[in-house]
Structures are given as C-alpha cells and as structure tokens.
C-alpha cells in the first residue's frame, strides 16, 4: 500500500501553488555541489533558525521527478535517522528562465561522514565509531525498506552528522528517479564505486532487476570507506570501475588490524549474488552491530572530535583548487563534490514544530519583515558596490604598477642602448684615432727610409762613378798591352805590388771574379744596362686577392733605378694561409727568375745585390707589374682601408685550360703567389695591407690561389675592369664597422712617367697568347646553355658579426618574429669588367642600382631562380666534383623578384657592386655570394636531395628560408626561359612576394631561450614553451613577449586541453605526469585573482614516475591518456564532474619490451588496442584481454632501432597505421600484416618526425626538412639547411607547424612554417 502512495498523491502537488521564499528564507552560503542541485545553508528570516535548502531548476521534463521527490520526502522523512523535510517553495524567475524549487530540510551542522574521515588523522575512523555509524545507517535503511523505498545512493557523502553526533540519511530515492535525467545529461549514474553489481548489471541489461539489498552492498563499501579513507577502486576511472565491479571478487579490508566481527560484517554486506545477501533485519542482528559498547560514550567522543575540528576550521581552510572547464556539454558552472557544512555557535537543529513557527504571528511581523528585507537588500547592495569598488581599485593599481614598471623598463632599455651606442661610438673613434696614428707612423717610417735610400743611392752613385772611371782606365791599359802577355789587373805605378793596391780595387777585382763564375755570359750586358741613364723611375705596385693598395710616390733613384720584373711561380705552390703575412714569403734569387725575365723583357736587369759591395741589407724584392686590357702598367686608387679579403680557387673553365693535357703555358701564372721580401722598400708601399688582409678561404675546393700579373684582352672594352687578378676575388663589405657601402674601384689616370710603358708597341709572346686564350674562353662561356640551379652548396663562411649586431640587423615585425624568407639574398653578377675571368661578384640587395643582365656570368629567370651557363662537358659531369673541388651544380636561394628597371632608375657601370646595411659573405663556389643569415635553402626537384656534407662553422643560427618549388613549377620556369633571357635590366631591390606566394614560408621568433626547448603547445593563439629550466608563454598576439610561468622545472612533453581547462605535462626531475590548471597559469600572468595564487595550481596523475611518453586520444566523448613507463603501459581516462580529473582505466605491467612511444586505437569503434614502439620494433596490446604481440620487427637492422612515430591512418577504422623508425617507415595493420608494398624512405636519419593534419608527415634532419605524403610516402617538398643543425618538432595547428633549433648548452629559437593549404598540390 505504501508503495503506491507516491504515485497516487502526485496530482495533489501543484508546483505553481507553492509560495515564494522571499521574506521567509534567505540563503547564507553554498555548502554542497551535488549532481542534482546545489545545497545551501539557509536561515529562517523571522527566527534565525538554520536549515538546509536544496535549490533545483524546474524544467518541464523534470517536473514529474520533482513531484515524486517532494512526495517521498513528505511521507518518509519522519525518522530519527533521516533528514527531516520541512517544506518547498518556488522562486519565480523572469520569462525565459526556469523557476527555482527550494526544498527546505533539516540542517546537519557537523557535515558528512566523508568530511569526518578527511578531518581524522590517518583518514581512518575508530572501529567503534564505524559500528555506531553503520548501526544508525541500518536503522534508517530499515525504515525505508519497510516502506518499499530503495535509497540507491548510500555513501559517505550522503550520511550527515548533526552537532550532537546524530546520523541522518539524505538524498534517498532521488538517484533512481533522476536516472533518465542523468542519462540525458551524459553524466555518470550516481556514484559507481558504491554501486552493487546487480545495479550495474541492470544498467547494462534492461531486463535485469534488483531490490533493496543493493543498499546493503553500498553500506559495506561505506564501511570500507570509513576504515581505509576511500572506497575500493577509487583511483580507477568511473567507467573502468563500472566494468570491474561485477567481474572482480568482492572487496575485503586490506589491513589485518580490524576485528573478526568487523571483517565478518564486511563479508556479509559484500556478497556478489544479491539473492544470497542477508536482509536488513538480519544485519541488524550481526554481532558487529548488536554488541556495541556504551552508545552514549561513542557519541560524546564523536561530538568532541567534531568540536575540535570546527575550531581548527574556524579560519578559512585551503581546499583543493577547484576549476571549471567546458566539457562541450550542458553542465553547471561550478564543479566538485559537496564540502563540509559549517555550523555557527549556538545553532540548533529545527524540530517538527518548524512549520508552526513559520506561520505564527504572520500578520504582526509582516511590516517588520519587509523592513528587514529592504535593509538587508540595501546592505547587500552596498557591500557588493564596495567589493566592486575595491576590486576595480585593485585592478587600477595593478595596471598603474605594471605601466610604471614597463615605463621604467623601457627607460632602462633606452638608457642601455644609448650607453651601448656611446661605447660603440667611443670605440670606433678610438680605433679611428689608432688607425690614423699607425698611418702617421707608417708615413714617417716611409719618409725616413726614403731619405735613407736617397743617401744610400747617392753613395752608390759616387762609388759606381769611381768604379766606372777605373774600369774605363783599365780598358785603355788592356788595349795597350800585348794580347798574349798577361798584365796586372790594376795599374797605378810600375812595379806596385798587389798588397799595395787600394782596398776598393781588391774588392772590385774579387767581385768581378765571382761574377764570372756565377754568370759568365752577362757582364757586357749588365754594363750596358747600368749605363742607360734614360730609364724612368717606377713606383711599386702590389696586389693581393684582387685588391690594390693606394698609390705611393715613385722612388727617386737617378743613377740606378730598380727595374720591374715579372715573376712566375709554380701553380702548385702552397696557398697563402691566414696565418702567414705576405712579407713572410721567401724571396727568390736571380737565377730562380732568369727564365721568366728572358721571356717577358727585352732587357736583362742586374740584381741589386751586385750593385752595392758594402750594403748589409737583404736583397731587394722583384717588382710585380700590373696589367690592364690596354696597358702594361695600371694603378687603381680610392680603395677604402680595412676590407677583409677572401681568395678562392680559379674557375673550372680556366682550370681545364691550364691542365697539362692542354699544353697551355698559362698554368704557371694561374695560382701563383705574391713574392715579398722583408726589405722595407716593398713593405712601405702598403701601410695598411697587413691589417686589411684578414684571411683566405677556399671553401670546399681543394686549392686556393692569389693573383699573379696577367694581361687582359681587348683594350677599353670593359671600362670597370679590375686588372691583375686571375682568380675569383670576392670582397666582403662589413657595413656595420665601416658605416658606408663599398664603392666600386675607379681606374686611376696614367701618370706621365708611365706613358712610355703604356704605349709600348709590342708585347711578349706568352702574354699575347694568354690574352687570346682568355678571349676564346669568354666566347665559349657566352655560348653556354642556361642551366637551372638545383643543387646546393653546403660550404659556408664564418660570420664575423656579433650576436648583438645580427639581432640589430634583423627586420623584426610587429609580432616579434623575423621573416626568415624575407631576409635579403645575394644574387650573382659578372665580375666588374672582367668577363674573361667569369668572377661572379655580389650585388647588395638593398641597393638602388641596376646592372645589365648581359654582364652576368649567369642570368636570372622571371621567377627569381638563378640560371648558370654550363658547358657540354659540365653537363656530363653534373652532380660530380671537378678536379679543383667544385661541385658540378651551383645552388642559390631564389628569392629576388626580377623585373625591368623602373622609369627614372639610373643604369650604372657594368661592374658596380653595391651593399647597403647588410653584411655579405662569400660562398665557396664560383664566387657566388650568399647571405650570412641563410639557413634554409629550397629545392625545386627532390631528386637532387643527396648533397655534399655541410661544413660545421660558427655562424649564428639566424635562419632564413626560401620558396620550395615542385617539378611542375620547374617546367613552368623552363617554359619562360626565353622570355627571361630577353630581360636587359634586372631590379635587385628585394620585394616581399610572400602575401601573393603559394609557397611555404618559415619565420622565427627573435627571442632566444637560454636552455634547450624540449616541447611546446598552443594555448589559444599563444605558445606555451617547455625547456630544460621551466615553462614559459610566448605571446604571439603581441610583440613576441615571453612570460616566465614556472622556473627550475624540466618540461619534457605537454598538451593543452582547453575544453578541460588543463595542461597535461611530463615534468620535473622524476618525470611525473602533472596536470596544470590553465586558470592558475593565466593568473600567473594577469595576477588579477589573489585567491587563485594561494592555491596549488597542479595535481599529479596517480603516482606515476619515470614517464617516458604519453598520448591523448579522443574517442567519441571520452579522452584517454595512454602513458609509457619504464616497463609498463598505463591507460587513464578523463572523468567529468564531479571528479574532473584523469583516473586510472587499465594497467599493463612487466612488458617484454620497454615502451618508448605509445598510441591508442579503437578498431572499428569497438576494440581498444595500445600500440607502442620499442628498441626492437612495434607491438600491440589488446586492452580487453591484455595479450601482447609484435606487429613489425625490422629484421634487416642489426641492433637497436629508434622509433619515431606511430600514425593511425585515416579512413581505416583504426586498423592500419604507418610506423616510422630510423630513416624508414612501413605500413602495417593492427595484426602485423604489411598493407602497402611501399617503404617510406627519408633522405637522411631524422631527429624528429611528426604527423600534420594536412595528411602529411614531416621529418627534421640535420641537412633538411622533408615533407611527405602519409598515404604514399612520396616526397612533397624539402627545405635544405645551409649547415648541419638539429631541429625538433614542437606542435602544429591548421597550416602552422612549430619547431625549434636544438643546441645543447646553447641558445634555442622557435620557428614556424606556414603551409599554404590551397597550394599544397601545386607546391
């Protein structure tokens, strides 16, 4: 009969007829956050008595359930162990909003049994306390069961205590009646850890049934909770617990300290077969319940404990940090389980006469109630306004403080910059003064030596005059003597003995004898040459690396001027190294140069060493003439000082001409070294030579050469030519130190004393032949076909600029990034006026000058790709090294957009070289210039991926990137080649073509991280960066500012789950799995919530340590977390409210292979399988059965392998995957069968591999970044590095891929690549 009463009385309840609680009850504070509503501590306005008020929204769907609950509370709450129901109210809300139902019940001020457990030392209650509480629960259940009512949700949280230690049950009958609502809300039914197996079976099988004995199972679990602090399986995910409870044996007490009566009581309650479980009345007679000590004594102990706890909690306790996250479902904003319920001193429990008190003296107190209500509302509003004002004031103060701090930092930064500029200016001024002082010293030394030489020359002149007079007299005497008669050599007086001859006569005679021995065929020629008084004086000229020193005054030697000599040195001679100064080279004697003198001069010159018998100076060096196309002697001036010089090998074409097989006499000249003695005569002509000659370099080539004297071909055809250089000389202009661009060298005007040599009517035969060969070489080079640049030069030069200077030179955008691809590139041009040498000089890309394309050694296509002329022989040897060490292909970044010269742009001389505010470096092949910033070079065809090894250098990792074209784009460029050849003027001004480009782009953030970047994750638009030393946030929405969030903690892996409001990480020294709350991290930046700062911002997932790798896998509405440990794999799953954390789902320990990489797949939406990679191969664990088996073991590789990635292929129902290891990847299914006859083959061993959501897979190697199709493994594109470097994938979203440079112990930077999705097929 009683069971029918709730249904019969439903019609009697009219929710709309319920009164409004305004003026009767008021809410004081929230004390509980339940699944079905919020529980407040309330106060009766008139009497001040406290009540528990449950507030629920009334919707049309739930009206019937609410009526049932009210009816059950009315009928069955009148028991000493059930919280008493006092009444219900409806709080009306405006249209469009649900009304609120207020259920008013007895208030239990001591909180729940769960709170009692938490506040007890060791989280365990005394056995007699447990027995008392269990007996009181059983009495309440007995009352309900007699009326055929099942509570369905017995647990510690629903068992409350009053101040007098009375036990009350709450929320009975609600769980079952609200099951349909719970299902609609997609939340978990009740609390699974306390649920009986038959209840779970009923959820799985609608035909199954259960009775009131299910409450007794829940009572047994609650008894374990009171004994051990938590129910069994509480660390498990609720879904996993629901699965395990019917399958596991009934739980038991873990500790042996409990009495046998208690253990027997647990065993009686926890009988899995509910039909064999004892009834409520039988359990009431169990010894553990029946044989209890003095009840009054137990209640006194409990009351004292409750009072002590209340005093300790008088101060606001720090609870575990609560946060809310969007689960993409309709949930309440607040989360968490009901916390302890506080009770103020003097509070008492409402009795059954509460309704009478509520309605008494209603008319008399109406006015007073209204006044109190209005006053209270005014006080509340005033309090709210005060709180808002205080908060606003605090926010304003924080803003002002931040503004002052930023202003102070800005001023300090400006002051530092100003000081640095002053220091730099002072240093430059000091260097300039030092340079001027050195120049003055050199000039003084030069003048002093000049005067000394003049005096020495005068002495020699007088001495030679005496010798000449003596020799003339001696000839006259010989003519007078008889031919056969031997006369004395000197005649002064008849009969003078040899001992009486003057000393100078003896010396002359001795020297003549020595000269006859050394060169008997020369004396008469020498005498004739010395007596020639008409030779003009010559100034010395000397050239190193194609740079000619400033003009120096000629030597004044009227009697015996020094004669220029052409010196030929073997091309096989050693290269001039950076450690050798020029004047340290050995000086050759006359005999070593005699052959060259006989060929190249009509006159034989006498060496200086035989002209002065008294000089102790070393022999004077030979002079090296400079030749121009139209002259024998040419000097250039206006050369700026302090220009570092580089020398490289000669061109391959010249090298072939000079090979022994060709029989050319050109070889001895090419590659010759300058010969310089230590005599001051030669050194004084170049006061700044030693300081300007920094070093020589040959890049990857096998030989380096310095210039030799060499004539040019047709005179006057190239007005800007540089004479006297047979090599590819390249000038690197350091604009930061010089402050001005390097200007082209203008030929100096020929001085009058040189005019006789310049207009000389004939040339030596070998020089004429040389000019002819060079003209033929130029014609041959001009007729070469154009060749597309596809290869890459791996050699690079050291950057001499400091890190600070490089940063100053970068073009920073508003978001703190540097457009790596927009850094100006240097394109090749012809050597200034020296086409027969094919010296590809450098053109400054910031300059405003243009050059004729016809003067380029190579020409530029419209798309900006460099074209190199190539002979037929070079075509055959394409891709191989020439004999001099050059690669057959030449590669340049194709970043400069070509166009005709705009109107009004002046056309400068053909050989102009201009630089502007950009430090330039020289490449190692063909003298081609490349930017020092270049770190990524594009390839137009993936087949040329195999490149020569890169050179390790100290160049700063300021990276740039270029466009990457496919073979389709290559064909389009080839089709436009003829049109590109017709371009006569090339605009070398860089144009930012990125916004209109379909090619990928790489940018970088200017921020340098002091420690190695290990991981990163996008949080909104910003980037969380994990390093060896902490967690930082890179503000991508602003100026690229970096905020430190956590210091001195290593972050190995991280993922942001914004819907859950958490950041999942592997962090710390012990590699724990920690979950950080995003709201806490946000407050670390904004500092706008002091309460949040006091609370712990993270929790650990289980007690896991030594985590190696994890993967977050979302399947339908469930988020799984699969974790690789040292020799185990754990699976956790996200539990929504009220848990709101990752909870254990399943564990697989003692694995045969150590997992290094893990993933989770759901086969055909039904079977869960863990895939993991080890040093042996790849393996699978069936989650249901726990069986493990191998799916791929690479047998062709000996030893351990390195697994890189596991990619579950789309549209395969989770059955097929691509597994990447070492430099390979294979396609297999979850049962170990190879699904595709293709192996993904990387060009090199990648350091990082990642799947991106454009259905591609990227590999980061030391030489390149490769992008391949996941479906086929085909190469879609590649970015080459300028030098070997380690890069690491961080994260990706949409069309952006983030990665970082990895430098152990050095600075690291963040890069991101923008992949244009619309053009991926054409890229």
Curated annotation (Swiss-Prot):
GO BP term, example: positive regulation of JNK cascade
Pfam family, one: CNH
Membrane-traversing stretches: none
CNH domain boundaries: 1010-1297
EC number assigned by the record: 2.7.11.1
The keyword Transit peptide appears for this protein: no
Alphabetized GO MF terms: ATP binding; protein serine kinase activity; protein serine/threonine kinase activity
Protein name: Traf2 and NCK-interacting protein kinase
Domain of life: Eukaryota
Segments of this protein annotated with the region Disordered: 284-347, 397-559, 571-838, 939-960
């Amino acid at each position: 009969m009683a069971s029918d009463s709730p249904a019969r009385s439903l019609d009697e309840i009219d929710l709309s007829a319920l009164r409004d609680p305004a003026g009767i009850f008021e809410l004081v504070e929230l004390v509980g956050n339940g699944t079905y509503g919020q529980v407040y501590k309330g106060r009766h306005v008139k009497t001040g008595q406290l009540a528990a008020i449950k507030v629920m929204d009334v919707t049309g769907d739930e009206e019937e359930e609410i009526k049932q609950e009210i009816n059950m509370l009315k009928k069955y709450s009148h028991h000493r162990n059930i919280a008493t129901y006092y009444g219900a109210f409806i709080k009306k809300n405006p249209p469009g909003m649900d009304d609120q139902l207020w259920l008013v019940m007895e208030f239990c001020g001591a909180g729940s049994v769960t709170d009692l457990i938490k506040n007890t030392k060791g989280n365990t209650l005394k056995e007699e306390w447990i027995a008392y509480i269990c007996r009181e629960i059983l009495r309440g259940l007995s009352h309900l069961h007699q009326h055929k009512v099942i509570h369905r949700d017995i647990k510690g949280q629903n068992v409350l205590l009053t101040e007098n230690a009375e036990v009350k049950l709450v929320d009975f009958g609600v769980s079952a009646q609200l099951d349909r609502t719970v299902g609609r809300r997609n939340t978990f039914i009740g609390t699974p850890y306390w649920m009986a197996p038959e209840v779970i079976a009923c959820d799985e099988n609608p035909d199954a049934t259960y009775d009131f004995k299910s409450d007794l199972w829940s009572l047994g679990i609650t008894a374990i909770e009171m004994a051990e602090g938590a129910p069994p399986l509480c660390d498990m995910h609720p879904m996993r617990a629901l699965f395990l409870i019917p399958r596991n044996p009934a739980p038991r007490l873990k500790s042996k300290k409990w009495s046998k009566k208690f253990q027997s009581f647990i065993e009686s309650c926890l009988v899995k077969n509910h039909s064999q479980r004892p009834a409520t009345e039988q359990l009431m007679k169990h010894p553990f319940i029946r044989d209890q000590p003095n009840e009054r004594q137990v209640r006194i102990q409990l009351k004292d404990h409750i009072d002590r706890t209340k005093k300790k909690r008088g101060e606001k306790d720090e609870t575990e940090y609560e946060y809310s996250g969007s689960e993409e479902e309709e949930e309440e904003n607040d989360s968490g389980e009901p916390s302890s319920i506080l009770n103020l001193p003097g509070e008492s429990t409402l009795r059954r006469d509460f309704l009478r008190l509520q309605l008494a003296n209603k008319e008399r107190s109406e006015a007073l109630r209204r006044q109190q209500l209005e006053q209270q509302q005014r006080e509340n509003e005033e309090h709210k306004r005060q709180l808002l004002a205080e908060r606003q004031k605090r926010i304003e103060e924080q803003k002002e403080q931040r503004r002052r701090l930023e202003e102070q930092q800005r001023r300090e930064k400006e002051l530092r910059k100003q000081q640095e500029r002053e220091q730099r200016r002072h240093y430059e001024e000091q260097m300039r003064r030092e340079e001027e002082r050195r120049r003055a010293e050199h000039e003084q030394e030069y003048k002093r030596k000049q005067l000394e030489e003049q005096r020495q020359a005068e002495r020699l002149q007088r001495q030679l005059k005496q010798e000449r007079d003596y020799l003339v007299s001696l000839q006259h005497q010989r003519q007078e003597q008889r031919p056969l008669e031997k006369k004395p050599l000197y005649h002064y007086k008849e009969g003078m003995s040899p001992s009486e001859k003057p000393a100078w006569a003896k010396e002359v005679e001795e020297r003549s004898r020595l000269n006859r021995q050394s060169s008997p065929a020369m004396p008469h020629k020498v005498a004739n040459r010395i007596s020639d008084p008409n030779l003009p004086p010559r100034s010395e000229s000397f050239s190193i690396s194609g740079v000619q020193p400033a003009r120096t005054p000629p030597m004044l030697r009227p009697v015996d001027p020094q004669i220029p000599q052409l010196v030929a040195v073997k091309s096989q001679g050693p290269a001039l190294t950076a450690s050798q100064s020029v004047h340290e080279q050995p000086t050759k004697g006359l005999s070593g140069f005699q052959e060259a003198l006989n060929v190249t001069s009509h006159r034989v010159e006498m060496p200086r060493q035989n002209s002065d018998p008294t000089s102790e100076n070393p022999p004077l060096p030979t002079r090296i003439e400079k030749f121009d196309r139209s002259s024998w002697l040419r000097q250039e001036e206006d050369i700026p000082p302090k220009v570092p010089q580089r020398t490289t090998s000669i061109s391959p074409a010249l090298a072939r001409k000079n090979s022994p097989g060709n029989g050319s006499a050109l070889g001895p000249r090419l590659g010759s070294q300058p010969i310089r003695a230590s005599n001051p005569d030669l050194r004084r002509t170049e006061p700044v030579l030693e300081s300007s000659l920094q070093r020589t370099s040959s890049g990857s080539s096998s030989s380096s050469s310095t210039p030799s004297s060499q004539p040019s071909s047709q005179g006057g055809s190239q007005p800007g030519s540089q004479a006297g250089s047979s090599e590819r000389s390249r000038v690197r202009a350091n604009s930061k130190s010089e402050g001005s661009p390097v200007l082209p060298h203008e030929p100096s005007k020929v001085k009058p004393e040189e005019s006789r040599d310049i207009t000389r009517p004939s040339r030596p035969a070998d020089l004429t032949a040389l000019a002819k060969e060079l003209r033929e070489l130029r014609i041959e080079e001009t007729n070469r076909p154009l060749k597309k640049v596809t290869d890459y030069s791996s050699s690079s030069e050291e950057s001499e600029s400091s890190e600070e200077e490089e940063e100053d030179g970068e073009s920073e955008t508003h978001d703190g990034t540097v457009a790596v691809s927009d850094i100006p590139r240097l394109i090749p041009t012809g050597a200034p006026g020296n086409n027969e040498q094919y010296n590809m000089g450098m053109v400054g890309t910031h300059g405003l000058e243009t050059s004729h394309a016809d003067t380029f050694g190579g020409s530029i296509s419209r798309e900006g790709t460099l074209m190199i002329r190539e002979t037929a022989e070079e075509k055959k040897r394409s891709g191989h090294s020439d004999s001099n060490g050059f690669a057959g292909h030449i590669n340049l970044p194709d970043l400069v957009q070509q166009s005709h010269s705009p109107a009004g742009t002046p056309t400068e001389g053909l050989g102009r070289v201009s630089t502007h505010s950009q430090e330039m470096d020289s490449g190692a092949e063909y003298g081609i210039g490349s930017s020092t910033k270049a770190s990524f070079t594009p390839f137009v065809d993936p087949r040329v991926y195999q490149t020569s090894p890169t050179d390790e250098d100290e160049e700063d990792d300021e990276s740039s990137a270029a466009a990457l074209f496919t073979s389709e784009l290559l064909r389009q460029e080839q089709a436009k080649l003829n049109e590109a050849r017709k371009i006569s003027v090339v605009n070398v001004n860089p144009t930012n073509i990125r916004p209109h480009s379909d090619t990928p782009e790489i940018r970088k953030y200017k921020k340098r991280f002091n420690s190695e970047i290990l991981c990163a994750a996008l949080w909104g638009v910003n980037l969380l960066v994990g390093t060896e030393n902490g967690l930082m946030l890179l503000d991508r929405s602003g100026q690229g500012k970096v905020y430190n969030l956590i210091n001195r903690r290593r972050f190995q892996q991280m993922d942001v789950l914004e819907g859950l409001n958490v950041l999942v990480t592997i962090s710390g020294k012990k590699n724990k799995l920690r979950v950080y709350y995003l709201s806490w991290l946000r407050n670390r930046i904004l500092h706008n919530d002091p309460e949040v700062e006091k609370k712990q911002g993270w929790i650990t997932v289980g007690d896991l340590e030594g985590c190696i790798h994890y993967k977050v896998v979302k399947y339908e509405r469930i988020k799984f977390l699969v974790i690789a440990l040292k020799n185990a794999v754990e699976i956790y799953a996200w539990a929504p409210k009220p848990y709101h954390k990752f909870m254990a789902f399943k564990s697989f320990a003692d694995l045969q292979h150590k997992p290094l990489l893990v993933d989770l797949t759901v086969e055909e939406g039904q079977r869960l399988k863990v895939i993991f990679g080890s040093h042996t191969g790849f393996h699978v664990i069936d989650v249901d059965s726990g069986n493990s088996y191998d799916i791929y073991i690479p047998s062709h590789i000996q030893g351990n392998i390195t697994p890189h990635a596991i990619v579950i292929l789309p549209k395969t129902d989770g059955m097929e995957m691509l597994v990447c290891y070492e430099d390979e990847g294979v396609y297999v299914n979850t049962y170990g069968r190879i699904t595709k006859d293709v192996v993904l083959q990387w060009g090199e061993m990648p350091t990082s591999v990642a799947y991106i959501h454009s259905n591609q897979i990227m590999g980061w190697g030391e030489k390149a970044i490769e992008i391949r199709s996941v479906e086929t493994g085909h190469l879609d594109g590649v970015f080459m590095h300028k030098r070997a470097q380690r890069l690491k994938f961080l994260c990706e979203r949409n069309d952006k891929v983030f990665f970082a440079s990895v430098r152990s112990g050095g600075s690291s930077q963040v890069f991101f690549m923008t992949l244009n999705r619309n053009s991926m097929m054409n890229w």
